[in-house]
Amino acid sequence: MRHIEFTGSEIADFEDFLRDPRAVYDPAANNGIKIRSVHLPFLPFEEIDPASGNAAVGSRFLETQRGIVKAAASVGIEIAVVHPSAEPYSEEERPERLACVIKRLSELKKITDEYGIKLAVENLPRTCIGRDIREMTAILAAIDGLYACFDTNHSLKDDNVEFVRALGSRIIALHVSDYDFINERHRMPYDGKNDWKGIMNALKEAGYSGTWNYEVSTDGRSAAEFTENYARLLENA
């Protein structure tokens, strides 16, 4: 293990990091591990949803993420991963919500540019905005210099191999796990239905050279199990 992602779902998860970024970053660095990316918070939904039509929610989203981006930049973290929306959203409101996402991420991109960090938008499942190739490519096309974080257990509409090919070189981060195509499950690769050979080859075609970041329920697993799993993925690619 050489690279990890610092992650938190809720704003409260980042209190210590905001207070003293070094206290979080240095213990990893002192053990030869680089925190390469930070996963920006997405909860509470009603407070920081970038797809919201409420201007106050949009402002809170940007204010919250600015503080975390600034802290991340101060310790040399390179990438900020962001969820494009909360949920649920109906089919009828998706165009309006997508427009809000593009507006807010455009503003967030200015903030990450200010601090020298790359911004990567993550594909999401179910009714979230960014759930399929069409919405993800629309977001990326609208914001110059925005990148993608591809989650291998989120697509419930499009084939993952085709998804990777569609996002191509815009992918600079991964969240790796397996699932049953019914809902996200965060299982170890080969414990679900993903076509791992196809995904690995599509990532090669895209020129992906970033971190292979597992986002798996540990369930008491050892570090050796992840090492063995990654070796199997490489062997079968």
Feature roles, as predicted:
Residues M1-S74, D113, Y147, D159, ...:
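N-terminal pre-domain/capping segments
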Residues I4-F6, I35-L40, A80-V82, L119-V121, ...:
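Hydrophobic faces of well-ordered beta-strands that scaffold small-molecule active sites
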Residues T7-I11, L40-L43, S85-E87, L124-R126, ...:
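Active-site beta-loop-alpha junctions enriched in small/polar residues
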Residues E15-L18, D49-A51, A55-A56, E91-R97, ...:
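Short, solvent-exposed loop/turn segments at secondary-structure boundaries
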Residues D16, D20, R60-T64, C100-R104, ...:
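Soluble or luminal CAZymes and related metallo-dependent hydrolases
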Residues D20-N31, V101-I111, F163-A166, G198-A202:
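Catalytic-core regions built around general acid/base machinery
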Residues N30, E47-Y147, K157:
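Active-site acidic/histidine proton-transfer and metal-coordination neighborhood
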Residues S106, G130-C149, S155-A237:
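Histidine-acidic metal/acid-base catalytic patches
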